[in-house]
Amino acid sequence: MFARLIRYFQEARAELARVTWPTREQVVEGTQAILLFTLAFMVILGLYDTVFRFLIGLLR
């Protein structure tokens, strides 16, 4: 039982050693892209919300 568990962790460690990890610059660029997309999406949704709230207000 413990031999299988030990083998599992050894294989997992070996697999992680083969991973090509991103550089710090790549992580920063990816994070900036995600933040920019999120901000743009928030603005678009906010504008839609404002327009629809105004239009629904006209119906009342």
From Swiss-Prot:
Cytoplasmic side: 1-31
Record GO biological process: intracellular protein transmembrane transport; protein secretion; protein targeting; protein transport by the Sec complex
Keywords, alphabetical: Cell inner membrane, Cell membrane, Membrane, Protein transport, Translocation, Transmembrane, Transmembrane helix, Transport
Membrane topology category: Single-pass membrane protein
Transmembrane segments: 32-52
Keyword Membrane: yes
Location(s), subcellular: Cell inner membrane
Gene Ontology cellular component terms for the protein in this record: plasma membrane
GO molecular function: protein transmembrane transporter activity
NCBIfam families in the record: secE_bact
Quaternary structure and partners: Component of the Sec protein translocase complex. Heterotrimer consisting of SecY, SecE and SecG subunits. The heterotrimers can form oligomers, although 1 heterotrimer is thought to be able to translocate proteins. Interacts with SecDF, and other proteins may be involved. The channel interacts with SecA via subunit SecY.
Name this protein carries in UniProt: Protein translocase subunit SecE
Organism listed in the record: Thermus thermophilus (strain ATCC 27634 / DSM 579 / HB8)
Taxonomic path: Bacteria, Thermotogati, Deinococcota, Deinococci, Thermales
